């Protein structure tokens, strides 16, 4: 079996097209979408229509939950931009998405962790910024294999950082990274930035071999300039810079007490 995992598209239709084209060359049997699909200053309607037509196995992320809340005025800028443009059929589609998905007997999908769409699975944030999670931290988030998620492979998203980690009990946790946005800053639970260092669209390709699962964290080139220009037109120069470079602007970098982890695919 060969599986493509995509996540965190954030309305970047051009990056999505590039990733889907690359997936088509790999012979993947199935593609799964791990959420955070539309929120951002880009192509909301067009991305929704493209994905609804594909009918991929899909879960919701925190941004789907947030963008469907009733009070648009209380939303962050990215969710509000999406919420104002969602058509009724888009809302119905997003509302029907599950928070987690058992894709096969071996494969389990979540956005953040199995129990929380806002928690980073393979990274941790403290007063010093963001760092890779320890094995103990990741294992705690996965839960006891006997009582919680016992599947051999757990797919997650949310952080935009492509990474794979095998737990001591043999379970494999894979984050494919983000299709649509390669850098951002956040202040929860502490100020930190995430930077992948290039504008490439990310996804993961998993292939079942006799010895276990082979994981490829793929970085796909695409022309990010139209997305950057659109973000700029919609009043988001921070997104424009991140889309062009894979880095946050210097003012956001200065907000993190220690230089964050940079993942380069």
Task: Show where each model-derived region lies.
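Active-site-proximal beta-strand elements of phosphoester/diester hydrolases
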Residues: 1-10, 106-113, 173-177
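Core catalytic region of metal-dependent phosphoesterases/phosphodiesterases
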Residues: 2-95
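Active-site environment of divalent metal-dependent phosphoester hydrolases
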Residues: 10-15, 39-42, 64-69, 102, ...
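His/acidic metal-ligating clusters that form di-metal
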Residues: 26-27, 86-165
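Structural motif
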Residues: 30, 57, 153, 171-173
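Generic beta-strand structural signal
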Residues: 33, 102-103, 166, 208
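Acidic, His/Gly-rich catalytic cores of divalent-metal-dependent hydrolytic chemistry
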Residues: 166-265
């Amino acid at each position: 079996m060969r599986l493509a995992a995509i996540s965190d598209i954030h309305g970047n239709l051009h990056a999505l097209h590039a990733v889907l084209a690359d997936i088509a060359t790999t012979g993947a049997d199935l593609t799964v979408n791990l959420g955070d699909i539309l929120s951002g200053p880009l192509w909301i309607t067009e991305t929704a229509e493209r994905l609804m037509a594909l009918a991929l196995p899909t879960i919701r992320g925190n941004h789907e939950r947030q963008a469907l809340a009733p009070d648009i005025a209380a939303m962050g800028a990215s969710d509000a931009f999406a919420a104002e443009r969602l058509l009724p059929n888009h809302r119905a589609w997003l509302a029907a998405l599950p928070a987690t998905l058992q894709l096969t007997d071996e494969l389990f999908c979540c956005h953040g962790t199995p129990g929380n769409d806002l928690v980073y699975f393979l990274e941790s944030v403290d007063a010093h910024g963001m760092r890779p999670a320890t094995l103990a931290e990741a294992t705690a988030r996965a839960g006891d294999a006997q009582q919680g998620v016992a599947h051999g492979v757990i797919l997650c998203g949310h952080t935009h950082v492509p990474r794979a980690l095998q737990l001591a009990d043999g379970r494999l946790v894979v984050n494919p990274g983000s299709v649509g946005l390669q850098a951002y800053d956040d202040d929860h639970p502490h100020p930190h930035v995430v930077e992948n260092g290039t504008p490439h669209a990310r996804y993961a390709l998993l292939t079942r071999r006799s010895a276990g699962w082979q994981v490829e964290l793929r970085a796909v080139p695409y022309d990010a300039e139209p997305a950057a220009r659109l973000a700029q037109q919609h009043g988001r120069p921070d997104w424009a810079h991140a889309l062009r470079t894979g880095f946050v602007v210097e003012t956001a970098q200065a907000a993190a007490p220690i230089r964050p982890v940079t993942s380069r695919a």
